[in-house]
């Protein structure tokens, strides 16, 4: 046990030595893609890929917390994913129950706070209960915020937010002059979080699939070739090193 702890500490130190500690992205968002293809390559059912993907979430959460990432948003289930086979959807809906049952004690120990964005009221009762229990048990934690985007879609979020803004303006007798970027930001599901500096998508696909479409306007995109179950701590560090090698301009010019 002691040897294992020493090895873990050495690994974390090695990762920290590879990175510029002054330029760790505060908020990393990940599109966890490739579970189904991972299983298909191994002639396994798709649900096996989702199970292995859950193990990857644990690894990435640990390392993100250890290196000082403040926010980690994971695209767990989109508003479009309901069209998948019922058996697969049912399995995915049960994953948070199993995941949080086994991982919650460690999340509490590591001071990780569990949060969600998305239309979670539409989820099965058991899923909602597991999520709410994790939120309650970690509510006072002050470390990494682990944010699951579940039953989430960027367009659906914008429609929902626009309706709320319209109702607010109407009820308070305000006109549209009040609307600016800050006003919109304050009505999004992500209002309590900074925009992601880094967006990672695994599996090699190069699209954002309706994920945080407002929030990633100035994010750095990295499309990693690994399927999500194969994505590990080393791959995350590689992505962060690529991010650190770039110069973020926000539409301006770089300094010569």
From Swiss-Prot:
EC id: 2.5.1.-
Active-site residues from the entry: 33, 81
GO MF assignments: ditrans,polycis-undecaprenyl-diphosphate synthase [(2E,6E)-farnesyl-diphosphate specific] activity; magnesium ion binding; manganese ion binding
InterPro entries named among the record's database cross-references: UPP_synth-like, UPP_synth-like_CS, UPP_synth-like_sf
Record-listed Mg(2+) binding positions: 33, 220
CDD domains: Cis_IPPS
UniProt lineage: Bacteria, Bacillati, Bacillota, Bacilli, Bacillales
Name of the protein in question: Isoprenyl transferase
Cofactors, names only: Mg(2+)
Keyword Magnesium: yes
GO biological process per UniProt: polyprenol biosynthetic process
Function: Catalyzes the condensation of isopentenyl diphosphate (IPP) with allylic pyrophosphates generating different type of terpenoids.
NCBIfam families cross-referenced by the UniProt entry: PRK14830.1, uppS
Record keywords, A-Z: Magnesium, Metal-binding, Transferase
A Pfam cross-reference name: Prenyltransf
Cofactor detail note: Binds 2 magnesium ions per subunit.
Binding site for substrate: 34-38, 46, 50, 78-80, 82, 84, 201, 207-209
Stated family: Belongs to the UPP synthase family.
Gene3D superfamilies (alphabetical): Decaprenyl diphosphate synthase-like (3.40.1180.10)
GO CC annotation: cytosol
């Amino acid at each position: 046990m002691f040897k294992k702890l020493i090895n873990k500490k050495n690994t974390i130190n090695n990762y920290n030595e590879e990175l510029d500690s002054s330029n760790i992205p505060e908020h990393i968002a990940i599109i966890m893609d490739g579970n189904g293809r991972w299983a298909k390559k191994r002639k396994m059912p798709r649900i096996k890929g989702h199970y292995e993907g859950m193990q990857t979430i644990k690894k990435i959460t640990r390392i993100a917390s250890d290196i000082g990432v403040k926010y980690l948003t994971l695209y767990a289930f989109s508003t479009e994913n309901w069209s998948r086979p019922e058996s697969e959807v049912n399995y995915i809906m049960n994953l948070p129950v199993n995941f949080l049952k086994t991982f919650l004690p460690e999340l509490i120990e590591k001071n990780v706070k569990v949060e969600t964005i998305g239309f979670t009221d539409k989820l099965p009762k058991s899923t909602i209960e597991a999520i709410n229990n994790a939120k309650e048990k970690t509510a006072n934690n002050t470390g990494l915020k682990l944010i699951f985007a579940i039953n989430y879609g960027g367009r659906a979020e914008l429609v929902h937010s626009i309706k709320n803004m319209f109702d607010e303006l109407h009820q308070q007798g305000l006109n549209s002059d009040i609307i600016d970027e800050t006003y919109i930001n304050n009505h999004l599901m992500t209002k309590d979080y900074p925009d992601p500096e880094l967006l990672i998508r695994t599996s090699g696909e190069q699209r954002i699939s309706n994920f945080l479409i407002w929030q990633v306007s100035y994010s750095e995109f990295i499309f990693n070739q690994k399927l999500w179950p194969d994505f590990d701590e080393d791959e995350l560090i590689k992505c962060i090193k690529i991010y650190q090698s770039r110069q973020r301009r926000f539409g301006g010019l770089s300094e010569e």
